[in-house]
């Protein structure tokens, strides 16, 4: 009997907390920041590609 009351209380708290939203979608901001960091890394690799190729060619000429 006590276990069912505790389970019901926990479930009621979960439902109450899940239905309340204080700010518009605050949990997605963390994922957007991670996505932005990944995008910046990808763009940096794309921009550095030609420079790395030139360094590789220069190293090949030096041998």
From Swiss-Prot:
Keywords: Amidation, Antibiotic, Antimicrobial, Immunity, Innate immunity, Secreted, Signal. GO terms for biological process: antibacterial humoral response; defense response to Gram-positive bacterium; innate immune response. Transmembrane segments: none annotated. Residues 1-22 form the signal peptide. It is found in: Secreted. One of its GO terms (cellular component) is extracellular region. Pfam families: Cecropin. Residues 23-26 form a propeptide. InterPro entries: Cecropin. PROSITE patterns: CECROPIN. The modification Leucine amide is found at residue 61. Belongs to the cecropin family. Has antibacterial activity. This is Hyphancin-3F. It comes from Hyphantria cunea (Fall webworm moth). The lineage of its organism: Eukaryota, Metazoa, Ecdysozoa, Arthropoda, Hexapoda.
